Design a protein with these regions (language model features):
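Short loop/helix-cap segments at secondary-structure boundaries that form the rim of catalytic
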Residues: 34-39, 145-149, 195-203
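Short, polar loop motifs at secondary-structure junctions
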Residues: 27-32, 125, 191-197
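Anionic group-transfer/hydrolysis microenvironments
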Residues: 27, 48, 158
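Active-site segment flanking the S-adenosylmethionine/decSAM binding pocket
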Residues: 135-171
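S-adenosyl-L-methionine
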Residues: 1-37, 247
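Long, positively charged, glycine-interspersed low-complexity recognition regions
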Residues: 167-247
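Hydrophobic "anchor" residues on beta-strands that sit immediately upstream
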Residues: 21, 42, 152
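Class I S-adenosyl-L-methionine-dependent methyltransferase module
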Residues: 40-137
């Protein structure tokens, strides 16, 4: 699987399980939540065309296509592979570095020497996911334009503090408007942030170490979870909405 800045790959198991048949990720990125529950009806949405194109490529790709990508070793130079399509170059750019917000243009020997098996592991991960995502719907777009429907909404936007590194960054987000939008969703709503955020009443779920510091991941949800505190239960977080399956 490819690495992406802000991915929930290490902590996805701590988020509430989906209670609806459909999952919608309006800020999809590497879509680790949907991958965990891949058999669901999944809609991925992202404004960043590079990410959407990579997902479309993977949806169409075969194992042969993935294995046909150039071998990546310590001397790998992406610029020499001029025959690759733009989307293949971008996919490889996310394979040869960790937690990037845009595809890397080159592999560093230091990174590779410290992680000699990582590329092979990621290639295997890509092959494993190919049959899992054939039924998904993937579109380029913005959350504001999505139909409100009964679903598990896994909302992981660029963070209020720290989300400036994305190509489609937090600078273009009105967080008050986003908060109201999240509260109005039908079904189950799970919103990701860290504890510095102020635009919803987030509460912590796990503390984790980043490259240079610790941070605490938090969530807001319209369903009761094991992370709820007594104070939050007393003050409430709005109306609870049950999932409704519509034929």
């Amino acid at each position: 699987m490819f690495s992406y800045y802000g991915s929930k790959s290490k902590i996805v198991q701590y988020y509430p399980s989906p209670t609806c048949d459909k999952i919608i990720e309006p800020f999809a990125g590497s879509a680790r939540y949907s991958l965990r529950y891949f058999e669901k009806d999944v809609l991925l949405v992202d404004k960043y065309k590079v990410i959407v194109d990579i997902w479309h490529y993977l949806q169409r790709a075969s194992e042969k296509d993935i294995l046909g990508l150039p071998k990546i070793d310590i001397d790998f130079d992406l610029s020499k592979h001029v025959y690759l399509s733009e989307v293949e170059k971008n996919l490889i750019g996310f394979l040869i570095a960790d937690a990037q917000s845009a595809p890397s243009k080159k592999l560093t020997k230091k990174w590779f020497s410290l992680r000699p098996a990582k590329i092979e592991h990621r290639i295997k991960g890509l092959i494993d996911l190919l049959p899992k995502i054939k039924h998904w719907k993937i579109i380029q777009g913005s959350y504001e334009n999505l139909k409100n429907e009964n679903a598990t909404w896994f909302i992981d936007p660029p963070y209020q503090f720290g989300g400036e590194h994305y190509k489609e960054s937090n600078k273009n987000i009105d967080f008050n408007s986003l908060a109201n939008w999240c509260k109005s969703r039908l079904g189950q709503v799970i919103v990701c942030e860290n504890t510095n955020a102020t635009w919803l009443d987030f509460y912590p779920i796990i503390r984790m170490k980043g490259a240079n510091k610790f941070s605490t991941e938090s969530i807001w949800t319209n369903f009761k979870t094991q992370y709820d505190s007594i104070q939050q239960d007393l003050f409430g977080r709005g109306n609870k909405k049950e999932c409704v399956n519509v034929a």
